Amino acid sequence: MTDSDPTLRPDRLPEDVQATDDRALRPQSLDDFTGQEEARANLRVFIESARRRGEAMDHVLFHGPPGLGKTTLAQIMAKELGVGFRMTSGPVLAKAGDLAAILTNLEAKDVLFIDEIHRLNPVVEEILYPALEDFELDLVIGEGPAARTVRIELQPFTLVGATTRLGLLTTPLRDRFGIPTRLNFYTIAELDQIVARGARLAGIEADPKGTAEIAKRARGTPRIAGRLLRRVIDFAVVEGDGRLTQGIADSALTRLGVDDLGLDGADRRYLSLIAENYHGGPVGIETVAAALAEPRDALEEVIEPFLLQQGLIARTPRGRMLAHKGWTHLGMAPPKRPDQGELI
C-alpha cells in the first residue's frame, strides 16, 4: 500500500535517519499508537465517517514539533482507510510538473503525504489550490502567445500535510485543510510505554525502572526515545549483561551527554550562553544564533520548543530570557535585579 518510488523522495529527510530500525517500532494502527489521545479520537471518527460514506477523507494538516508521529499517523490513516499511500516533501516539489505527475497517478481516495509543506514553491502551491478544492489541475502548456491552459480531472484524494512551522503556511493553503490537528509533546508515562514496546520488539529484557529512565530523558519526543533506546541497548549488550536496567540506562545516557531533564550539549550551550554572556537576557535570537554558530531555524525548531515547554526560557518582545528554572538547572544563581530605589 505504501509507494516508495525513489523519484518522490530523492533526498533523505530527517525522519528517514534510522528508518530501517524505526519501521519495526512504528505502530501500525490507531489502537497501537500511544499518546495524542485527542488527535487519535478525532481521527478515528473522521476515518470511520469517510469509510461509511465511501468518500475520500477530508484533507488533514498535522503541525507541531518534529518527531511526534506526523508521518506515522499519515501512514496509519491510509491503512485504516484501506487505500494507497504516497509520500513526498515540500522541497522536492520544485516545479508544477512534479506535483502534476504525482496527482495524476493517484488512485481514488488515496492518501498523499507532503512533509515540510511550509517549504512548497509558491508556484506549486498555486497549482495545488484547485486540486484540493475541486480535484482539478490547471496546467499551462507552451509559452508566450501560444500558451494555453489545460484542465485535468483528478481522482478524489486526501492530502495530509505536515509542518513544524504552522506560521509559515500561507492563509489560503492553511484554510484548505478541513482537519487541522496539533500534535503535542508526550508525557513520561506515554514515552515509557513506547520505550517498553520498543525493547520488547528488539528482544531485550527491560526493567521498568530502566525504561522509565529513558522516557524521562526523551524530551517528550518518541523519535528521541527510540534513538536513546537503541544507544542504551548497545551499552547493555557490550558493557552489561544484555538487560536494560536503570543503572545501565543512567550510565549510558550520562556518557552520551543527556542529563536528567533530557537536555544535551546543544541545549546546555544555549542556556549557558544566555546566562554567562548576557546575564540571563533578554537577548535577540539572531545574536544567540550567531554566537552559537547555529541557524536561527535550528534554534527555533529543535532547541527552543522543549526549553519553552519545560519553563527553562521565556520569549519576550525584547528577546530570549533565562527563566528561574533555567538558572536552577544550570546550578547558578540569577543576578540580582536593581530595585526602583536603586534606579532613582
From Swiss-Prot:
Region (Head domain (RuvB-H)): 260-344
SMART domains found in the cross-reference section: AAA
Organism field: Jannaschia sp. (strain CCS1)
Family to which the UniProt record says this protein belongs: Belongs to the RuvB family.
Pfam families in UniProt: AAA_lid_4, RuvB_C, RuvB_N
Places the protein is found: Cytoplasm
Record GO biological process: DNA recombination; DNA repair
Known catalytic reactions: ATP + H2O = ADP + phosphate + H(+)
Entry's EC annotation: 3.6.4.-
Subunit structure: Homohexamer. Forms an RuvA(8)-RuvB(12)-Holliday junction (HJ) complex. HJ DNA is sandwiched between 2 RuvA tetramers; dsDNA enters through RuvA and exits via RuvB. An RuvB hexamer assembles on each DNA strand where it exits the tetramer. Each RuvB hexamer is contacted by two RuvA subunits (via domain III) on 2 adjacent RuvB subunits; this complex drives branch migration. In the full resolvosome a probable DNA-RuvA(4)-RuvB(12)-RuvC(2) complex forms which resolves the HJ.
CDD domains referenced in this protein's UniProt entry, alphabetically: AAA (cd00009)
Signal is among the record's keywords: no
Residue ranges with Basic and acidic residues bias: 1-25
GO molecular function list: ATP binding; ATP hydrolysis activity; four-way junction DNA binding; four-way junction helicase activity
EC main group: hydrolase
Residue ranges, annotated region (Disordered): 1-33
Origin: domain of life: Bacteria
Record region (Large ATPase domain (RuvB-L)): 1-186
Protein's name according to its UniProt entry: Holliday junction branch migration complex subunit RuvB
